[in-house]
Amino acid sequence: MTDEVKAVSPDGGVRPWPAIGWVRRMGPAILVLRLLVAAGTVATVHSRVGSGPGVASQGGGAQGSAAGIAVTYQQAKAAGTTANYDWGPGCDISTGRLKMPMVGAPPCVAMSTKPNGGATWSGVTGSTITVAYYIPAPGGLTTSLAGATDSTQAQLATVQAFTAMLNRIIPLDGRKVVVVPFQATGGSDDPVAGRADAISVAQDLHAFASLGGPQQTSAYEDELARLHVLCLACGLSVPYSGYQQDAPYLWGALPSPDTLLTDALQLVVSQLVGKDAIYAGESSMRHRKRTFAMVHYDQNPPIYGALNQKLTREFAATKLRLVDNESYLLDLPELPQEAATIAAHLKASNATTVIFAGDPIMPIYLTKAAAAIGYYPEWVITGTVLTDTTTLGRLYDQQEWAHAFGISSLPVPLPPSQAQARTLYEWYYGKAPAAAKTVSLILEPIELLFVGVELAGPDLTPTAFQQGLFHMPPTGGGPTDPRIGFGPNGPPPLPAYSSPADFTLIWWDPTATGVNEEGAYGTGMYRYVDGGRRYPAGKPVGGTVHFFSRAGSVTGYAEPPPGSRPPSYPPWPGSPTAGG
């Protein structure tokens, strides 16, 4: 097994930065994961390795056929054939979705009139679908961070509870999902252990899919793809080339950096190019035409080659010129010095406007370094992982970040008690989940799995799963419920293996007060322009955007606004709340 792993990944597929002592790296990392949990998302910076033999591209290498995927109520309605099918007692035909108190509940599908295909794929039988639930190794980065929120036992109990609930509600053609805990054997940055664990999941557990994986190496999901096993929520900063490489097995819950940077670039071109830097902190800059610089994360060797080439072409097409283009590696002990060097370069370049496309830790040091040398430009937020959250924004130099604005794929925040995952759990079970802090994080990949299996139809394969999600009716599009869609309905580049498919506009208000994503009261918050209005990914923002205008902006909602409120249904028959 060891020799096979080494042969598949001669370069290891691991992060390029040097090993860092546990105490030195855990401080900022604990903060980040606490935020991730509160926001209901886990973000990783993703390294890519060769696909190895047998990995599908665009689903072409996956065996099985997309024929026979489920018919949704929306499809039948468009064809005028709804009367030809049995939609089951759980379908609300007024919405075409299951009777669940959710915005964007799973779609209704026509009940199958024939037995399912039985053992259609590894991990699939006529009655069960085996799914691995990845548990990080004790003492590893993810375990240590998660310990600051909910215990592994509480999270696993909540996973099993959601699985039991969805098995009762979502029709899976006579099958039930069986979640099997899988204990990782190595750290989150160990590619050899990651590949060995993937082999165990595929060949020992015979899993159809894995929920989660190691956060600091792509070896696990790459190997699962090679072995034709799905991996959901295994990496959320994957460049689009990574999704193409591992298709149809890898699925994410945040837009690819390709999507975010393209949308940010279009905002820059439509709103900023050729105009004075009126939002800069230095008065002398406000009467100068904007000059642009970019600061972005990368690895050694670079992993965003295709994306960088695309952006270079787009820069040329729009006549946008960068006076400085800075890249850095995420080596935490070196970030303060690296930030000081970058800040000096930015000031020397006379850039009025800095486009930031990196991790959420670097701005802590970069804004401090810029302030130390009296450099106060405009900061353009591209929505890369967590830089668009109030919890992190409060850690950036406030004199600097008072001039930050841009895009975000995240929804306008709601109070934790209003989180959809929590209200759904309480609707079914009549009590709070064991993992109350991580409940949103836990539900997301489980729901994606169930919906994909539901839409795949009776002959379940990875390709049918892919085609089912590609045909899923898109949901959402309101301030608190981003538009979710995949394939042709997701964010470009297409077909999409991650979502949301829209974004909103934000700016930092250093004087606003309220609670952040963790529920902590404080000063400094992101404001959402025009009440958090969403814009389709891949399309320019029209008109003139008035950043730094409080009129019409919000920092959050006490409850979902009209149009984004979930429907109300009685308890599901047989649920604990209904006395079952």
Which sequence ranges carry the predicted segments?
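N-terminal export and membrane-targeting signals
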Residues: D11-L36
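C-terminal region of N-terminal signal peptides and the immediate post-cleavage residues
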Residues: L36-S65
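N-terminal extracellular/periplasmic Venus flytrap/periplasmic-binding protein-like
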Residues: Q58-S200
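Extracellular/periplasmic periplasmic-binding protein-like sensory domains
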Residues: A247-P255, A369-E444, A551
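Extracellular/periplasmic ligand-binding modules, especially the Venus flytrap/periplasmic-binding
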Residues: S349, D359-Y365, L410-T475
